Curated annotation (Swiss-Prot):
SUPFAM superfamilies: CinA-like, Molybdenum cofactor biosynthesis proteins. It comes from Petrotoga mobilis (strain DSM 10674 / SJ95). This is CinA-like protein. Belongs to the CinA family. Coiled coil: none annotated.
């Protein structure tokens, strides 16, 4: 089955926001066996939206449109589908009452502009929105199925997960299984040079996980033996292999498995380590906390770093991250304490310590060691690379010591 995705909105075509909707839909569709042929971002222009719909009808069995279901003048998706497919628009009284009730309960008032959301395609199946006012719609046209979903990511996702995913899954006879392998510190070209030979008889794709490395997705028949394939891949790339999930989730899993706790003392990363980790549900089982000690004064006051240490060696030094790690241990009492201090730039670098220099301190129980790396990129890129480098090394440490 072939699918197309059309995401509407000036905020997409002007680069104001990223198209998370299409990414999510494409991944979910692929997981149940749909082949997404085309993803289109189109501005809030009726003729352009109609053109995208008509092009998609030429090539796809199932079409998803996201955005353009709100109450304003530039919400044009229902009208575009109506005109492209010659489907009437009708007023839905029951839906109108639900929308009025939703807004009254939320704000204590009703706005007449909201009535527009009650005009739907004739004979459409209404897909109730569990987290917002704009419902989704499902219509059939000349052997095609068209879904209209709201633009806000949480609303689109809620409707898809609640009303659509299970139905799509049941409609597909899926005799395939997909494996995902994640790698750190490896280029896509290096991976592909070997994998293209190993996987020549299988369907596979690679993707760059930003600031980390490539991921490899392999699609096989359920009765194919995956183990020999995995062994061949790992015989070449075991030292780069993260696991079958993303780096941060794999780190969380191994901390859970080993029953170890983790804390951070962050300087140049500014809370990025903790922010990335706590995005995982259940992080409180392994993560005790983080201190963002960005200034030298905060390192001294909160982590008991000696003023003389910073004056003699600098804030970005092995000596400083060591004292940061031990100071963190006194406060958090975690099994693993990690400190980070670096120069994210764009200024303050020197010949001895260029922009991108980052020192790490790793304190596991009473064993300490330090690492230094020099990252490239702008300020934000350096901070992100520094974050994932820390995760990779913590993962490696926990595996070697506890698993």
């Amino acid at each position: 089955m072939k699918s197309c995705i059309i995401a509407t909105g000036n905020e997409l075509t002007e680069g104001i926001i990223l198209d998370k909707n299409s990414k999510y839909l494409a991944e979910r569709l692929k997981s149940v066996g749909y082949d997404t042929l085309k993803i289109t971002n189109v501005k809030d222009d009726l003729s352009l939206i109609k053109l995208s719909i008509e092009e998609s009808l030429e090539m796809c069995d199932i079409i998803f449109l996201t955005g353009g279901l709100g109450p304003t003048q530039d919400d044009l998706t229902v009208q575009a589908v109506s005109e492209s497919c010659n489907i009437d628009i009708v007023f839905n009284e029951e839906l109108f009452e639900k929308i009025k009730k939703y807004y009254y309960n939320k704000t204590g008032k009703y706005l007449s502009i909201l009535k527009k959301q009650s005009y739907v395609l004739k004979n459409a199946e209404i897909l109730q929105n569990p987290v917002g006012s704009a419902p989704g719609q499902k219509v059939h046209f000349n052997g095609h199925t068209i879904y209209l979903l709201p633009g806000p990511y949480n609303e689109m996702k809620a409707i898809f997960d609640t009303h659509i995913y299970d139905e799509l899954k049941s409609n597909m006879k899926n005799d395939h299984v997909e494996y995902s392998l994640y790698f750190y510190g490896l280029t896509e070209a290096e991976l592909m040079q070997e994998v293209s030979v190993i996987l020549k008889n299988f369907d596979y794709s690679t993707k760059i996980e930003e600031y980390i490395g490539p991921s490899l997705r392999i699609r096989m028949q359920k009765n194919d033996d995956f183990e020999p394939i995995l062994e061949k891949i790992l015989s070449q790339f075991s030292r780069y292999f993260i696991g079958f999930k993303s780096l941060e989730i794999t780190l969380f899993d191994v901390l859970m498995k080993s029953s170890k706790t983790l804390s951070f003392a962050e300087s140049c990363t500014g809370g990025m380590l903790s922010d990335t980790l706590v995005s995982i549900p259940g992080a409180s089982n392994v993560f005790k906390g983080s201190l963002v000690t960005y200034s030298n004064e905060s390192k001294v006051r909160l982590l008991d770093v000696k003023k003389e240490t910073i004056e003699k060696f600098g804030a970005v030094s092995e000596e400083t991250v060591k004292e940061m790690a031990y100071g963190l241990k006194k406060i958090m009492e975690s099994d693993i304490c990690v400190s980070v201090s670096g120069i994210a730039g764009p200024s303050l670098g020197s010949e001895q310590k260029p922009v991108g220099t980052v020192w790490y301190g790793f304190l596991i129980n009473e064993d300490f060691f330090a690492l230094k790396n020099v990252f490239t990129g702008d300020r934000d890129e350096i901070r992100k690379r520094a974050t994932y480098f820390a995760f990779w090394n913590i993962l490696d440490l926990v595996r070697k010591r506890y698993l």
